[in-house]
Amino acid sequence: MAILKAEERTDSRRSSLRRIRQSGYVPGVIYGRNLENKSVALDSIELLKILRAEGKNTIINLDINGDQHSVMVTELQTDPLKDSIVHADFKVVDMEAEMEATVPVNLTGEAEGIKQGGVLQQPLYELSVTAKPKNIPQTIEVDISSLEVNDVLTVGDIPTKGDYSYNHEPDEVVASILPPQKQEETEAESAAQDVEEPEKGTEEEKEE
């Protein structure tokens, strides 16, 4: 478990937050059951190292002036222009109790349907899971190599290894392979012609 040192802070004025960020630290909040919310400041580089190496759902041992808590990051506020973290929220977790978390879905492999000109559609980029903190995956890897045109991958198709469960209906669509656009257009045009032709025949009969 990664250890991250933090200092409790009492000054929440904007000028104070600005000074914290300018010094290379990140303001944050730690909260949880049986714990009064605490405002903290921590090293931004160390936090980034942990998240990049172990993922957002990793358990961190947050050391606040010698008082240690097992926490997970629940929210990160970032500055897209500077590619930096400007605020972090940490939740104290019970290592033996199940909790909910969102996990990114990583599709791997090249689907057969894409090789045939199909188009990949991915409605779900994250899945909500329930598990003990140590069993929450950092990513859910799904091999889509076997998917062909018109195939659909649902939540129920993705195994869980038994140590976590999905908070979704089994038939929720994670990914699908749509037919090539030209094929769809041709089928649509053909269907339109089939509808128009009987109408023309009816008009000729009326004229007779």
Swiss-Prot record:
Protein name: Large ribosomal subunit protein bL25
Gene Ontology molecular-function annotations: 5S rRNA binding; structural constituent of ribosome
CDD domains reported in the protein's UniProt record: Ribosomal_L25_TL5_CTC
Phylogenetic placement of the source organism: Bacteria, Bacillati, Bacillota, Bacilli, Bacillales
Cross-referenced Pfam families: Ribosomal_L25p, Ribosomal_TL5_C
Origin: domain of life: Bacteria
Family: Belongs to the bacterial ribosomal protein bL25 family. CTC subfamily.
InterPro entries: Rbsml_bL25/Gln-tRNA_synth_N, Ribosomal_bL25/Gln-tRNA_synth, Ribosomal_bL25_b-dom, Ribosomal_bL25_C, Ribosomal_bL25_long, Ribosomal_L25_dom, Ribosomal_uL5_bac-type
Keyword Transmembrane helix: no
General function of this protein: This is one of the proteins that binds to the 5S RNA in the ribosome where it forms part of the central protuberance.
One GO term (biological process): translation
HAMAP family found in the cross-reference section: Ribosomal_bL25_CTC
